């Protein structure tokens, strides 16, 4: 209704989930913590969107996650279709474990610690950058007083 980023007033969705989204004037940007429906453990990510998504009137839905404040978030249909506003959701081991479980059979499978892996990669990048810069000069510039 507010014609955010387009002159289009309405547009049909794919029809995969019993949800409808209404665009809002204000963009939501926030860090969130959540629990995954049907899984153990908590996760975190961030939201960045202009919409409010609610179930289509008369339809039932299953929330995909529940935010830390108890608010249901996202939607899941069966085991093959999920919708969520949470960016970075696949960085959470509990989500990866949940996604892989139906295909792992009876094998005990657990995902690697992706956050630790990312931290390790950032440290490698920082070491590489430091090795090619005059760090004493940079620190001198940063601590110089006018």
Give a label for each model feature.
Residues 1-44:
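Cysteine-nucleophile active-site neighborhood
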Residues 6-9, 67, 81-82:
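Short, functionally important structural connectors and interaction interfaces within domains
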Residues 16, 45-47, 81-85:
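Conserved beta-strand scaffold positions in the cores of enzyme catalytic domains, especially
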Residues 16-22, 53, 104, 108:
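Non-catalytic alpha-helical coupling and interface elements of nucleotide-dependent molecular machines
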Residues 21-22, 50-55, 88-91:
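Short, glycine-/Ser/Thr-/acidic-enriched flexible segments
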Residues 26-28, 57-60, 93-98:
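Short conserved micro-motifs at the rims of enzyme active sites and ligand-binding pockets
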Residues 36-79:
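Catalytic beta-strand/loop cores that center a nucleophilic Ser/Cys/Thr
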Residues 72-146:
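Acyltransferase
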